[in-house]
From Swiss-Prot:
The protein's name in its UniProt record: Segregation and condensation protein B
Cross-referenced SUPFAM superfamilies: Winged helix' DNA-binding domain (SSF46785)
Complex formation: Homodimer. Homodimerization may be required to stabilize the binding of ScpA to the Smc head domains. Component of a cohesin-like complex composed of ScpA, ScpB and the Smc homodimer, in which ScpA and ScpB bind to the head domain of Smc. The presence of the three proteins is required for the association of the complex with DNA.
Xref: Pfam families: SMC_ScpB
Length: 199
């Protein structure tokens, strides 16, 4: 395992939220100048490799691994294709958590689900079911996510207020012993009742 591959791995697992130079330094133990040099090397690697679909983007000292703009049409076709019309269980769980807890950060979603959610969030964003709604005022300024109008259309809702209530939801806190199943179970009941009403 070399230094370059460590930085590349961190960019990959951080997903759409990205990772700051400071956090890369904390995790790897490399100093800032070394990380900047490795990032420049990776940027050059992706930019000069015409067969690579990836590139590195930087914003506010946060770096992300993203697909190149010219491949946007191909990526859109993938998410618009019939084979991807149905949400996976992980996508549904993540989406419903965002709906109930928005605005919410990726780390907060991970806390509720108990697993890493960056890849799932990225797919939901590409399907335009969630989007960035701002940044949380805390170290690292993590991205906050919320649902979109496409989310409402997908589930046949007129507004976010039509989401079914969760039991004692206002009493819940991210520190409580809860998981994504709490959210999806309530939503599934609501969907079943709505389908019966439309028969």
């Amino acid at each position: 395992m070399n230094n370059l591959s460590q930085i590349e791995a961190l960019l990959f697992v951080s997903g759409d939220e990205g990772i700051s130079v400071k956090n890369m330094s904390i995790i790897t133990g490399f100093d800032r100048s070394a990380i900047q040099g490795l990032l420049e090397e990776l940027v050059l690697k992706y930019d000069t490799d015409l067969s690579s679909a990836l590139q590195i983007r930087e914003s506010d000292d946060v770096y992300r691994l993203v697909t190149k703009p010219e491949l946007g049409g191909t990526v859109k076709q993938y998410f618009d294709s019939p084979v991807n019309a149905t949400l996976s269980q992980a996508q549904l769980e993540t989406l419903v958590i965002v709906a109930y807890k928005q605005p919410i950060t990726r780390v907060e979603i991970d806390t509720i689900r108990g697993v890493q959610s960056s890849g799932t969030l990225q797919k939901l964003a590409l399907r335009q079911l969630v989007h960035e709604v701002g940044r949380k005022d805390e170290p690292g300024r993590p991205i906050m996510f919320g649902t979109t109008d496409e989310f409402l259309d997908y589930f046949g809702l007129k507004s976010i207020e039509e989401l079914p209530p969760l039991p004692d939801f206002n009493m819940l806190d991210l520190g409580d012993d809860i998981d994504g199943e709490l959210f999806t179970s309530a939503f599934d009941v609501h969907q079943s009742e709505s389908e019966k009403e439309n028969v």
